[in-house]
Amino acid sequence: MTQYWLGLDCGGSWLKAGLYDREGREAGVQRLPLCALSPQPGWAERDMAELWQCCMAVIRALLTHSGVSGEQIVGIGISAQGKGLFLLDKNDKPLGNAILSSDRRAMEIVRRWQEDGIPEKLYPLTRQTLWTGHPVSLLRWLKEHEPERYAQIGCVMMTHDYLRWCLTGVKGCEESNISESNLYNMSLGEYDPCLTDWLGIAEINHALPPVVGSAEICGEITAQTAALTGLKAGTPVVGGLFDVVSTALCAGIEDEFTLNAVMGTWAVTSGITRGLRDGEAHPYVYGRYVNDGEFIVHEASPTSSGNLEWFTAQWGEISFDEINQAVASLPKAGGDLFFLPFLYGSNAGLEMTSGFYGMQAIHTRAHLLQAIYEGVVFSHMTHLNRMRERFTDVHTLRVTGGPAHSDVWMQMLADVSGLRIELPQVEETGCFGAALAARVGTGVYHNFSEAQRDLRHPVRTLLPDMTAHQLYQKKYQRYQHLIAALQGFHARIKEHTL
């Protein structure tokens, strides 16, 4: 009987399930859309019961369409978005809707913390910046605005922790994710009560479940879950992965010469290093990586291809091929139309919002689409340039995410950055990485390093056009000037409203 490992991937828009054999060959993938709720401007929530129903449905669909039985599945892992907040009450029931990482309701709290110097106080211990989607920001918001709900908190989790609990009935917070929550002391490798004390949320210390490893077997499929999904009761479930870690793992990032760029709702640039550094040029975000003694370092903001998805939804459905043809039909770096990809947040200050600048009657939809492509790449450059100050010997950027399927967009990224672009040929990095964690956890591999060596994916390479690089550098500089001017505008508005 052929054995398989199941990988679940819960993102911002889709819940996916993939099956892989011992050699990593895909036996099937199923996807179901996820609904995000926005009961008020700037809020982003998810119905927790509905998410579990969707999870069960995608597992059932995968088993049905693949012809694989639950008896053949010998391990399960989950990859998911980081941050946000999934709460259980003291009776182990979902406590309201989950709050997603793109939620901005805690902006005033974060602004207040910034004025009080809290981020600078936290960073040496947590190696995290502090923003609206962090669990700690959302917990403080609940304490101030929904105190009755806050008082009922029995367990604090994030996305894949919640789904793992649904599957197994066992609570835990997976380390690659919880290490980036501002609840975790990076040097100590554990929760630190002084953090919640500084943040004014010490009441939730009792609600923090045990920290579990990515490949650690945390529980088994319950009889109830088995009856609802077709899985076999007793199948082991491992801790899983923060999706950024899963992507870096699948991209084969293992030294300081190559970085990984993830292009999705979030613009993320990641690198792998051994040890923490003090006195760096920027407050780089660190997280625990899957190998002992290693850390993932990244820069990120919600400023990537989600902006294109919003545009096409609002202004008429158009296929990805048609978009690429439209963008390719225009001269590279031509014109003075700019797009600021800040629909869901920015990397240029809390007040910054999205928009086109320089639009005239001569511009067509193709020009707007080109400006979106450029704006997303320019925003990625903000993070890439900062990361290259730390990873000084980088010569290659490995790119994953939806835009990696667009040669037009990837060539633009190569031309703007001047870097060699490599595209790992793996379709579902979240599912594959989660299943890989399950293979490590069930003993197929001794560790993730051994698994990476055994499962190298082919890559496709694009090289920069250095003539276009010079043109894009000039336009990127103008983009930076526009950002600076708008930052000045917001600063003056703030002065007049005080």
UniProtKB/Swiss-Prot annotation:
Source domain of life: Bacteria
The protein's Enzyme Commission number: 2.7.1.-, 2.7.1.53
EC main group: transferase
Molecular function terms from GO: ATP binding; L-xylulokinase activity; phosphotransferase activity, alcohol group as acceptor; protein homodimerization activity
A single GO BP: L-lyxose metabolic process
Pfam families: FGGY_C, FGGY_N
Catalytic reaction(s) noted: L-xylulose + ATP = L-xylulose 5-phosphate + ADP + H(+); 3-dehydro-L-gulonate + ATP = 3-dehydro-L-gulonate 6-phosphate + ADP + H(+)
pH-dependence of activity, as noted: Optimum pH is 8.4 with L-xylulose as substrate.
Cited SUPFAM superfamilies: Actin-like ATPase domain (SSF53067)
The UniProt record lists the keyword Transport: no
Keywords, in A-Z order: ATP-binding, Carbohydrate metabolism, Kinase, Nucleotide-binding, Transferase
Protein family per UniProt: Belongs to the FGGY kinase family.
Summary of subunit composition and partner proteins: Homodimer.
Role summary: Catalyzes the phosphorylation of L-xylulose and 3-keto-L-gulonate. Is involved in L-lyxose utilization via xylulose, and may also be involved in the utilization of 2,3-diketo-L-gulonate.
Protein name in UniProt: L-xylulose/3-keto-L-gulonate kinase
